[in-house]
Amino acid sequence: MAHSSEPEYRLYVTPRFDEATQKDGIALRLETAKVFASFQYDLSVKETEDPSRLHLKVLGLKTPPLSLPATGHARFSREYEKLKGEVEVTVEGIEGKTATVLLKIVPNRIQVVRRPKGSFLQVITTDHPDTAFEA
């Protein structure tokens, strides 16, 4: 169990440009702070999205297809094209605890306008897409 000063989840957000569609967007990865020794699980997440809000509700863990034993964080990754301007992102954990971050999303840049209260969620942004999801 995490100490109260350690986050339960980390949210990585980075700008993305889709060469195929020629559209700007963001890449988002939510992962557990906890490292699992047996498998690198996927997070099962229910998404609710509208133009200015994104709600991510963690439902649980699932083993990825073709999973081989590996150590790692449980993860959920997704790309979004429709989120622009000021966007509120809320993460809801399995126990119902929530944290909300306010992001300003413009092409090639993501700025944290308001960080979540408490230490449940750590938010990490980068303007360098190549390094955004490095372990």
PLM regions: where:
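A short tyrosine-centered beta-strand micro-motif
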Residues: 83-92
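An anionic, turn-rich surface loop/hairpin at beta-sheet edges
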Residues: 59-82
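Short acidic/polar inter-strand loop motif in beta-rich domains
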Residues: 63-66, 93-102, 108-109
